[in-house]
Amino acid sequence: MKKIGYLGLGAWGYCLASLLASKGHKVVCWTTKPELAKHLTDTREHPLLAGHLSKGEMTFTTDMSEALKDVDMIVESVTSAGLRSVFEQVRSLGLPNCPIVITSKGIEQDTGMILPEVVIEVLGEEFRSLIGFLSGPSFAQEVIRELPTSVVGTGYTVEVIQEICETFMTPTFRVYPNTDILGVAFGGALKNIIGIACGISDGLALGCSSKAALMTRGLHEIRKLSVACGCKAETLNGLAGMGDLCVTCSSPISRNFRFGTLLAQGLSTEQARNRIGMVVEGAYTCVSALQLSKQHKIIMPISEAVYNIIQGTIKPIEAVSALMKRTIKEEHL
């Protein structure tokens, strides 16, 4: 069994750390919040996952060097905006020669880089062969209850991909190997924008037909931009693309979906963010996606509408009307 250093203790991080511990791995979890580390040590229950006690051997610390000492694998679940600074800390401590698994979803705003590439830029090109990525349709609230879930494990080498699958796989958590790390990362990041759009649709009570159109045309936008950036189209049709899109666009468990619903109900962006109480990755990814779309001359009307609503330059119902009045064109899926 492995000793695993886990960075980040939001709901998703705690959920995956608990899953790994339940398999017999020793998991040392790092957080920047002393009160959270103490609470988890005392209760074994995460505030965002009430009623679900952790299983197996888990310890909690605010000392990153303690979390990374003599580990066989590093896993992270921090925000996309905080990823670079976290791995700058990791680099300063020195690194063991072990796989590093990224589970955060997003695109870095200033660079337009997928998160595995951000980590490689920080740590050095020599670490590329150790980097992996786990993504797909999954909610912490469901995985912690051991409801059947299927995701994708990817990386830059077959060896790391295989190790991710073997390390995370359980009878209720299935991990499919995939060699297209770029496509998996883009699918996991861009679907959050469409999740906000579908939340807006629900908040405006526009019905199922509206949501179906947003999901279908949204996937088209995701696929166009992703392929232009070097991804394989078939990856976006799988769990990391269409699969993740489905759960994000159809469930209030998704914070991106809830964020969109709140915007449709008249809350400002700041008010909606405060109500959610957690990072809404789609709001940040929207900026990066539109920057990339301009570079590649890709038209993304749904993503642009979401961005304008978030910026407060157009009302949600006006954005819907503008989308419906666009010039007639071939569907071109």
From Swiss-Prot:
Q: Which UniProt keywords apply?
A: Cytoplasm, Lipid biosynthesis, Lipid metabolism, NAD, NADP, Nucleotide-binding, Oxidoreductase, Phospholipid biosynthesis, Phospholipid metabolism
Q: Which InterPro entries match?
A: 6-PGluconate_DH-like_C_sf, 6PGD_dom2, G3P_DH_NAD-dep, G3P_DH_NAD-dep_C, G3P_DH_NAD-dep_N, NAD(P)-bd_dom_sf
Positions bound to sn-glycerol 3-phosphate: 105, 136, 138, 191, 244, 254-256
Does this UniProt record's set of keywords contain Lipid biosynthesis? yes
* Recorded metabolic or biological pathway in which this protein acts: Membrane lipid metabolism; glycerophospholipid metabolism
GO CC annotation, single? cytosol
Q: Which cysteines are joined by disulfide bonds?
A: none
Q: Which domain of life is it from?
A: Bacteria
MF term (GO), any: NAD binding
Q: What is this protein called?
A: Glycerol-3-phosphate dehydrogenase [NAD(P)+]
Q: Which organism is it from?
A: Protochlamydia amoebophila (strain UWE25)
Q: What is the lineage of its organism?
A: Bacteria, Pseudomonadati, Chlamydiota, Chlamydiia, Parachlamydiales
